Amino acid sequence: MTSRTSLTIVLAAGEGTRMRSSLPKVLHQVAGETLLAHVLKAAPEGDGAALAVVIGPDHQAVAEEVGRVRPQATTYVQRERLGTAHAVLAAREAIAAGADDLLVAFGDTPLISAATFARLRQPLAQGVALVALGFRPADPTGYGRLLVQNDRLVGIREQADASADERAIGLCNAGVMAIDGKAALRILERIGSANAKGEYYLTDAVAIARELGLEAAVIETSEDEVRGINTKAQLAEAEAVMQARLRQAALDAGVTMIAPETVFLAADTTFGKDVTIEPFVVIGAGVSIGDGAVIHAFSHLVQAKIGKNASVGPYARLRPGTSLGDGAKIGNFVETKAAQIDPGAKVNHLTYIGDAHIGPNANIGAGTITCNYDGFGKHKTEIGAGAFVGSNSSLVAPLKIGAGAYVGSGSVVTRDVPDDALAVERNQQKVSEGWAKRFREAKTRGKTRPAK
């Protein structure tokens, strides 16, 4: 198998009108990745594995996603949407290059696995010319049935054309197919459009292969793996299946999740050893969590790196570009963005840290705000090692607070603070003795304010 070359053609030209969205269907997301990205990542890769993606004429965003996920892939445009076989032949140039195995998949099936693609190719190495992927849905209504005799696929019958006996067959066509590369164009170019819609259907390839004296077979997989996404409801169903997979994989890897069903992960989330995730945590794309870290309840993380033995939350929001050092702490109702928080630093309560670098073992008091935006651009705040910022302070960037410096509570700091210095910016406190007593007496007599 490893010596056989392959070409995977992913069909992604559909409009997806039932999604009721201006976004192309294959660019909707499951577990922080587009539907298309999931399929592209599952397709064979490495030496001898080519990849082609067929897109619509107005799908530049889809082409860009292909380039982001699999830069070596080639895109082809299906200018008229005339059926699945017509879409495959949009990549005729790639097919003609003569890979040993041709795989045809769909860009809206995010749950398909690399293992399934590998199983689909195995019969080709044994001389079978065409392999269809089948599944057994709980309700087969509407699906084409796979007709099998003596362990060989003899046809695909659409629901509308099936006899009563054929409709009783539980094995259905998933649409995914593997074809011997040497026979692929011979089969595909014989597919006609003599049907009610005047389209070219890939399912006709089975009958044509048999007419040519070639063998066809079936490989079965689960219904979940081949879920196609056509509506927002189906998108939600696929998300649920993917989340269940990701949670189980995390648990198997040793992550402690107190209530797994309340935790949402991304497809690329990575965990170290002895990580604990409390209930109602949402982890978006691009998050890595180091050994011994704890993510407390109701926290939300996206594109963030969490160091060893660090603590996040509860009720924390870590936005893209956050890097939390070993043993650092982000407490409750703290938001960070583009922030490097070094080992041992603490940001414990009610704070916004954006476009900032906080040095090792610095302490940021409750209610501190980095004022990073002046209405036109973002500016950086740098806080040195061991610095202490008192509660309710506003740090107006660009700003540097030196190592070991102190900022008095309630200060609005607009100028740099040297190492080991104290910065205090607030009005002098005024105390009027007896004022409160006079105020109460005045109110009692009906006056509005007491004498000063």
Swiss-Prot record:
Q: Name one GO biological process term.
A: regulation of cell shape
Question: Predominant location of this chain?
Answer: cytoplasm
According to its UniProt record, in which pathway does this protein act? Answer: Nucleotide-sugar biosynthesis; UDP-N-acetyl-alpha-D-glucosamine biosynthesis; N-acetyl-alpha-D-glucosamine 1-phosphate from alpha-D-glucosamine 6-phosphate (route II): step 2/2; Nucleotide-sugar biosynthesis; UDP-N-acetyl-alpha-D-glucosamine biosynthesis; UDP-N-acetyl-alpha-D-glucosamine from N-acetyl-alpha-D-glucosamine 1-phosphate: step 1/1; Bacterial outer membrane biogenesis; LPS lipid A biosynthesis
Q: Cytoplasm as a keyword?
A: yes
Start and end residues of each stretch annotated as Pyrophosphorylase: 1-232
Citing just one GO molecular function, the answer is: glucosamine-1-phosphate N-acetyltransferase activity
The record describes how the cofactor is bound as: Binds 1 Mg(2+) ion per subunit.
Q: What GO terms fall under cellular component here?
A: cytoplasm; membrane
Question: What residues does Mg(2+) bind to?
Answer: 108, 230
Subcellular localization is given as: Cytoplasm
Catalytic center at which residues?
A: 349
InterPro entries recorded for this chain? Answer: Bifunctional_GlmU, GlmU-like, GlmU_C_LbH, Hexapep, Hexapep_transf_CS, MobA-like_NTP_Trfase, Nucleotide-diphossugar_trans, Trimer_LpxA-like_sf
Q: Where does acetyl-CoA bind?
A: 366, 372-373, 391, 409, 426
Described purpose of this protein according to its UniProt entry: Catalyzes the last two sequential reactions in the de novo biosynthetic pathway for UDP-N-acetylglucosamine (UDP-GlcNAc). The C-terminal domain catalyzes the transfer of acetyl group from acetyl coenzyme A to glucosamine-1-phosphate (GlcN-1-P) to produce N-acetylglucosamine-1-phosphate (GlcNAc-1-P), which is converted into UDP-GlcNAc by the transfer of uridine 5-monophosphate (from uridine 5-triphosphate), a reaction catalyzed by the N-terminal domain.
Give the HAMAP family listed for this entry.
GlmU
Give the record's subunit note.
Homotrimer.
UniProt lists the family membership as follows:
In the N-terminal section; belongs to the N-acetylglucosamine-1-phosphate uridyltransferase family.
Q: What is this protein called?
A: Bifunctional protein GlmU
From which source organism is this entry?
Rhodopseudomonas palustris (strain BisA53)
